[in-house]
Amino acid sequence: MTSETTVNLLDFDAEGLVAYCGSLGEKPFRAKQLQRWIHQYNAGDFDGMTDLAKSLREKLKGRASIGMPEIASDHVSTDGTRKWLIDVGNGNAVETVFIPEETRGTLCVSSQAGCAVNCRFCSTGKQGFSRNLSTAEIIGQLRMAEFALRASLGRAPGPNGKAERVVTNVVMMGMGEPLLNYSAVVPAMRLMLDDNAYGLSRRRVTLSTSGVVPMMDRLGAELPVALAVSLHAPNDPLRDELVPLNKKYPLRELMAACQRYLKVAPRDFITFEYCMLDGVNDTEAHARELLAVTRDVPCKFNLIPFNPFPESGLIRSKPEQIKRFAQVLIDAGVVTTVRKTRGDDIDAACGQLAGAVKDRTRLAERTGAAGKIIEVRAI
């Protein structure tokens, strides 16, 4: 936790850090130096920033800090997925999940403590909404994960070349609706893309939204990254039930927003995420209806087997039904994947990011809810 009298430098993107250095009477190049020390060399204090003038280091000591997330627990799944539970104060916790694969390492980042959208199939929404995360709390998840993973592999901090980087992709798919925390999420994503910080390409940063149409347009104008849309239903009555935000931004408006976004997006398609719910949205008729509603949007489908939790009253679609549903889409020429469930033994699978505890304020119980905390090993 940082002192209330100091500024957390993790809250600044490049432009903000230049402005802050200017307020100290320093030139813009000092901001780049600071940014590299913080985001590439994992500096925890100012004494080791040897290319900064001693006078600047002394100024920073009295005015600024590099505040990092407080890790409450650190779990590794049997499949290599790693989940950090982060204490964000006042009994609230968020989760960050790293998914290792042969050709990439994907970090799933949270943007809010809880979520107000309250999708019926997502356990995070059932814990209610507490607050938005700050830019520091969002980018701090990437900083914490990248350097923890490097340490586990014996890799030293330093400029993020391809050979050194562990996190190659970031997905804003953790707890919360990112576009309802726009003012903090966008500076964090700017840092993810900045060559003086993490240097990821726009194609490797994906924001997932339940469909906040005005903010989709704003994101397209200001920082178009890869976009995923939590669709989950092929018609308005069903989506109203599963994704309550649909009552405000129905499918016709959402599809139009997707078309507008694609004019500026780094990828030439939208990824539509679709949680497979037995007897609810998983028939071949639903698949055909889905093709019709998305016909004017270049897209691919990511079918997500539902991860059950007691309060939902829902059941995962049977594997054979998921295959039949997918085949309808594939036969129509649409790229379709079925998400492999990862990290479900540590409650890190999609839709499980509330863990096993209903009350989001019971951090002590929740810390151990996913099972025994095991020794972190190399991935």
Curated annotation (Swiss-Prot):
It comes from the Bacteria. Residues 101-345 form the Radical SAM core domain. Its cofactor is [4Fe-4S] cluster. It is found in: Cytoplasm. [4Fe-4S] cluster binds at C115, C119, C122. It is an enzyme of class 2 (transferase). The active site is at E95, C350. S-adenosyl-L-methionine binds at G176, E177, S208, S230, L231, H232, N307. Binds 1 [4Fe-4S] cluster. The cluster is coordinated with 3 cysteines and an exchangeable S-adenosyl-L-methionine. Disulfide bonds join C108-C350. It catalyses: adenosine(2503) in 23S rRNA + 2 reduced [2Fe-2S]-[ferredoxin] + 2 S-adenosyl-L-methionine = 2-methyladenosine(2503) in 23S rRNA + 5'-deoxyadenosine + L-methionine + 2 oxidized [2Fe-2S]-[ferredoxin] + S-adenosyl-L-homocysteine; adenosine(37) in tRNA + 2 reduced [2Fe-2S]-[ferredoxin] + 2 S-adenosyl-L-methionine = 2-methyladenosine(37) in tRNA + 5'-deoxyadenosine + L-methionine + 2 oxidized [2Fe-2S]-[ferredoxin] + S-adenosyl-L-homocysteine. GO terms for cellular component: cytoplasm. GO terms for molecular function: 4 iron, 4 sulfur cluster binding; metal ion binding; rRNA (adenine(2503)-C2-)-methyltransferase activity; rRNA binding; tRNA (adenine(37)-C2)-methyltransferase activity; tRNA binding. Its EC number is 2.1.1.192. One of its GO terms (biological process) is rRNA base methylation. Keywords: 4Fe-4S, Cytoplasm, Disulfide bond, Iron, Iron-sulfur, Metal-binding, Methyltransferase, rRNA processing, S-adenosyl-L-methionine, Transferase, tRNA processing. NCBIfam families: rRNA_mod_RlmN. Reaction proceeds by a ping-pong mechanism involving intermediate methylation of a conserved cysteine residue. Specifically methylates position 2 of adenine 2503 in 23S rRNA and position 2 of adenine 37 in tRNAs. m2A2503 modification seems to play a crucial role in the proofreading step occurring at the peptidyl transferase center and thus would serve to optimize ribosomal fidelity. HAMAP family: RNA_methyltr_RlmN (MF_01849). Belongs to the radical SAM superfamily. RlmN family. This is Dual-specificity RNA methyltransferase RlmN.
